[in-house]
Structures are given as C-alpha cells and as structure tokens.
Swiss-Prot record:
Modulates RecA activity. It comes from Leuconostoc citreum (strain KM20). Belongs to the RecX family. This is Regulatory protein RecX. GO terms for cellular component: cytoplasm. It is found in: Cytoplasm. Keywords: Cytoplasm. NCBIfam families: PRK14135.1. It holds the Pfam family RecX_HTH1. GO terms for biological process: regulation of DNA repair. It comes from the Bacteria.
Amino acid sequence: MKTITKIAIQKRAGRYSIELDNQFAFGVAESVLIKYGLAKGRTLDEDLITQIKYDDAIAKALTIALNYLGHALRTTKQIKQKMRDKAVDEDIQAQVIAQLTQLGYVDDQNYANHYVATKKLITPKGPHVIRLALQQAGVAENMIEQALATYTFDEQCSIATKIAEKLAQGYQRESTRLRQQKMVQGLVNKGFSFETAQLVVDSMNIDNNAEDEQNNAKRQAEKLWHRYRHDESQQRFYKVKRQLYAKGFTSELIDAALLSLEQEEV
C-alpha cells in the first residue's frame, strides 16, 4: 500500500500531480481525481493505481478527441486516426468512441448527411466524388446510400448546369464539339455520372455562331501553323489539318483556315 502525500495542480488546466510516499507517481485529470476521491492521506494498492492510470489514459484520449471535434464534425475513423497519431492504445480508443457515441458527439450518419448537404449548397460536387470522400472518411456504405438518397436527380442536374455554365466560359475559343466534350469531362471530374453530364450539356445552347467558330478555327490554325513552321510544306499542312480535326472543327472550316494561311504566306 502507498499513501498520497501531496496533490499539486499542474500547469496544464485540469491536470494534477499525485505524490505517493513523497515521490511523484503519476498525473491525473480532474475528472479522475474526483471519481476516485483522491486526497492527501489516502492509501492506494497497486491494482487501484493501475485502474486510476488506465482511467486517466481514457480521460487524456477523450480530451484529444474533443479538441479534434471542436473544429468540425468527424467520423469514427477520423477520430480513431487522430488518437492513433497521438499513440493512444486501441482499447482506449474504443472506450473513447463508445463515450462519444453515447453522448451524441460522434454520429457517422449525421456526418454523411451534413457532408452531402454541404456539397450541394456550398462547394458543389457530384455524387461520385461525394461517395469517394465519405468512403475515405470511413462511413459505412449503407449510411452513404442513405445520405446520397437526399441528393435528387433534379438537384444534380440543376447544380451540374450551374457548373457547366462556368466551364463554358473558359472554353469559348474551342470548337463547339471540343467545348462540349471538355464540359462533359469537367462535370465528370466534379463527380457527376457521364450520363448526367451529357444530358446537362446537351440541354444547354452553347453552339458557337458561324463567325465565332470560323475565328476559333483560324486562331487555332495560326498557332499550329507557327508550331510546325520548320516542317516541310506538305507535312506541315497535314499536321495542322490533323490537329484541327482533333480539336473538333469541320473540314470546311479547316480548309478555309488553311487556305487563308497559305495565301498570307504568298
């Protein structure tokens, strides 16, 4: 048996140093101090000391988790990883998660629901990107499905249309076909299905008028014509023509652009 000879407040708020038989033995959280009624003069056996230290380890891990939760919602996996980074034993992690779950501080379904709502309203993303992020956060598939069920097809199309409108502004110098392809790919990259992306882009009136399409073809042709300026004339001609086809311009526009360039060099 050992006797508590001194209890002192540590610099860290809510922490106390315990001396047994005039020697520092361990530190405890205030909650542990109160739980075990630790006071000067009390005697402790080894089993009780072990239990006190174990409960204090839980208290410290709980503080780590609560501080982490203070900044944002977290999943069970994320909180466990945070404790693991702080070298918290797995059995203590389990104890902390159980307490947090009971208190309602950890709820993976609530996290998933909130995440989907945020990605619809604040930082728009499609369901595929959202699903991947939730999977990486450790949310169970059934919870992901339940959360994504609130993301209706009409909402997806509405959000995708707004994103596509912004994308369209960045591709004004492309051919209509390439512009559409890049918009579809942009929406897919944002997490929308190819079918949804194609449907949205097809529903938008983004065709360049004839003059814009002609100017775009001429502009692209000039760049390519300059790039291949050291090639032989025929090889240069076919390289530029092939590149313009790949960029989605029609043969009529390509021929007109190349004819104009050849005439300028005469």
